[in-house]
Amino acid sequence: MFERVFKLSEHKTTVKTEVMAGITTFMTMAYILAVNPSVLGSTGMDTTAVLLATALASCLGTLCMAFMANLPFALSAGMGLNAFMAYTVVAGYGYSWQVALLAVFIEGLIFIVLSLTNIREAIFNAIPLTLKKGVSVGIGLFIAFIGLQNSGLCVDSATLVGIISFPENFHTAGICALLTLIGLFFTAVFYTRKMKGAILYGILLTWILGMLCQVTGLYVPTPDAGFYSLFPSWGMTDFSKLGLTFGQCFNVDFSAVGIVNFIVVIFSFLFVDIFDTLGTLIGVATKAKMLDKDGKLPGIKPALLADSIATSAGAILGTSTTTTFVESASGVAVGGRTGLTALVTGILFLVSTLFAPIFTAIPSFATAPALIMVGFLMVGTVTEINFDLDNLTESIPAYLAIIAMPLFYSISEGISLGVISYVLLNLATGKGKKVAPLMYVLAVLFVLKYIFL
């Protein structure tokens, strides 16, 4: 059956290899079940509901990828996209999380149309390979920066950013930041020793060390300051809590939003999501070395369609945009080549719903090393960018995309600057003919965005 559905022999793989790859992928991205509730919880959403929604959306999206695209890619709530929803749309724009989810649902429907009409595929193929690699590196730095912030290591200071003063509030913020550094060290050791699931083991070890610190008095829970007990509440998952987010994207009071403002939110999500999703897919395919010599991904159309369906379904369940995860590359590294890898990962996400109380108790300082490590894995692509002086029309746009993402706290801004600079530099140096026509269209749209939005 597996041979008929996934064409294993054609892809030179076996059921055993695919199963191991699927398990590996899940182990390397299971941290999202702890991180996403932490990020979206800042909007007022119930963390258990977010975890269940994230797990179910991950399962659905990954199964779509398995059967529609036959690719070894797993999907879950995208890092960067969840931050955009929590810290920009809700905290920045002042909208409710219900409005944000409805915007995600609608832009998911729009994405389905764009995927069916080949527009997203055309955009993906129009972006030059060097810029794609720059996007992958930039996303890595962005994710690492979020990890440094969540850990408390990176703080707001007179120099815009700085490192925490460990002696101040040592028994709360100080010890959490220190535990993040320790967790990062062990995660790096696990990776160096080529342990499967190194990121997940790093999270668990950091959490255990935190609980030991609480027992010995090094960590003192201070709920009023946002520092809670690190011990989980044991028991069965309360699946009824999913009702707190399920379908809430349709429970919106438009009188408090305004149709014009709502359209702006949808466009913001659409704009960020299309380029964040493409950026992440670029990062996954680049890291997994699945792009062809022209920088194109074979079979991208059904993959984009699966991604789009998962986004709308995830919004109904109660989570931010669902997208392809760069950790899918870990399963590919083990030998995963078909949708069977994704099938195994999807099933494991479904099983994970039984352990929601444990995942929701994992503190942000324990998941921070995972974010920093994922950032490191993506930044490695920078070695594939040619920075020679005779290649500046390619490398400078990639460089601008890299530095813009973490410094402007936006993946889409990095892509915007990368595309605009690529077009302008090639035009100014007489190389305009090599630029894909769609790149000119994108550059104009980005410029108009800066003028009118």
Regions found by a protein language model. Name each.
Residues 2-36, 57, 78-87, 91-139, ...:
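Helix-loop-helix junctions within the multi-pass membrane cores of secondary transporters/permeases
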Residues 19, 39, 123, 197, ...:
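Residue-level signature of catalytic and energy-coupling elements of molecular machines
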Residues 23-30, 60-63, 67, 148, ...:
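Hydrophobic/aromatic residues within the transmembrane alpha-helices of Major Facilitator Superfamily
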Residues 43-63:
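Loop-to-helix transition at the N-terminal end of transmembrane alpha-helices
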Residues 58-79, 110:
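Juxtamembrane transmembrane-helix boundary signature
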